[in-house]
């Protein structure tokens, strides 16, 4: 699915004031980036940006080198040679605003991915500039590494580290019949890693960066299925000061866009959280965000899944059949709770991505062992039966009571249970650290006493 511009929203890129702000102050040491880029920076300590009205504003970059564009500048002939003149055999696929090729740099022998932007694209140049700047300033293990770029004449190319396992979309929706589907543990690991990349953009960059095109095809996989976010051409700087959103022309991918952004053009970090929820649902269900080949009523993933969230007896139906039942039922419920909270229609009710990272890190650490499947499945089924009895007025309502008093509260109740488990895990970890610290202090004290006695 490609990018689209929907509705006839204003092209204004200014920040609109509103009454409240959900974003705290960022530390001065955080990476600083500039918006509305008109050209690549020359390496100075300031980046200038121009608003539609023509007025300039300057964003100071840290003096620790973040302001320097570290990416290497390539000549077009170097990249043509690396890709055998963009031979069809080196073609990897379509990326945002261009085609991606596999290449090998003659100078270093490094295998790379080369994205050649569409020279006829109306926005290709802006997206090129944004991506070069973003990936040059922002570095994180879950963001793809930009090696360099080419801006010879009208040529616009980006050179990335090569991600050998392709995209998450490949493994979820384009998997050959002879290939094994991602297992439950790997899906949770990928979700947690992708969320960490998004958290870095939202909470560590200053001002925050809104990704704006979070989707399964933009999550690339390295060796070991380590996920990295790619394609930053649509990224926008988030609101600053007392602003709570950015007003911009609606861009993104159908099926992933948050409803408030699609309708009003008002963009916040919670817009990314919605998109993350859609991708997380793809991981859980194995379904596409939009699939025209599915029966009527099941073509839109979110619209299909939402009613199922209100009936715990149907939770199992949300699991990807290719998992073949090899997943912990309780973890499935918890994962669905996270997804449900992320795709809430009201942006204010969605969690912050930092909270999502906490929840998914917990789930990713609860490794599922297929060899223990039978006993665990029996325990989960007993818990499910307790829930059923509770519906009829009996039973104890155990920790598998995911819904509480009303069905519509089930995602919230599950989130509460998940938070309780996370808090318990934190408490145990803190207790261990405290115990280790206390033992170390005692050891040092005893050692000091022993040395004192020996000298006496």
From Swiss-Prot:
What coarse category fits the chief subcellular location reported for this protein? membrane
Tell me which species this is from: Arabidopsis thaliana
**Entry-annotated residues carrying Phosphotyrosine:** 160, 261
Segments for region (Disordered):
1-57, 368-456
Name the chain's protein: Serine/threonine-protein kinase PBS1
EC main group: transferase
Sequence motif Recognition motif required for RPS5-mediated plant resistance to P.syringae, location on chain = 292-296
Domain of life, per lineage: Eukaryota
Phosphoserine is found on 21, 217, 247
Topology term for the membrane: Lipid-anchor
Under what conditions is it induced? Induced by flagellin (flg22).
Q: Does the keyword Cell membrane apply?
A: yes
The consequence of residue 242 to A is:
Strongly impairs cleavage by avrPphB and RPS5-mediated plant resistance to P.syringae
* Lipid-substituted positions (N-myristoyl glycine): 2
Residues that, per the record, bind ATP: 92-100, 115
GO annotation terms (biological process): defense response; defense response to bacterium; innate immune response; pattern recognition receptor signaling pathway; protein autophosphorylation
The protein's job, in short, is: Protein kinase required for plant defense mechanism mediated by the disease resistance (R) protein RPS5. In case of infection by Pseudomonas syringae, AvrPphB triggers RPS5-mediated defense mechanism via the cleavage of PBS1. Both kinase activity and cleavage by avrPphB are independently required to trigger the RPS5-mediated resistance. Contributes to PAMP-triggered immunity (PTI) signaling and defense responses downstream of FLS2.
Sites of S-palmitoyl cysteine lipid attachment are 3, 6
**Result of altering residue 4 to A:** Affects plasma membrane location
Q: Where in the cell?
A: Cell membrane
Gene Ontology molecular function terms on file: ATP binding; protein kinase activity; protein serine kinase activity; protein serine/threonine kinase activity
Q: Where is this site: Cleavage?
A: 243-244
Q: Which reaction does it catalyse?
A: L-seryl-[protein] + ATP = O-phospho-L-seryl-[protein] + ADP + H(+); L-threonyl-[protein] + ATP = O-phospho-L-threonyl-[protein] + ADP + H(+)
**Mind telling me which CDD domains this protein's record contains?**
STKc_IRAK (cd14066)
> Protein kinase domain location, by residue?
86-363
Assembly mode = In infected plant cells, it interacts with the P.syringae virulence protein avrPphB. In uninfected plants, autophosphorylated form interacts with RPS5. Interacts with FLS2.
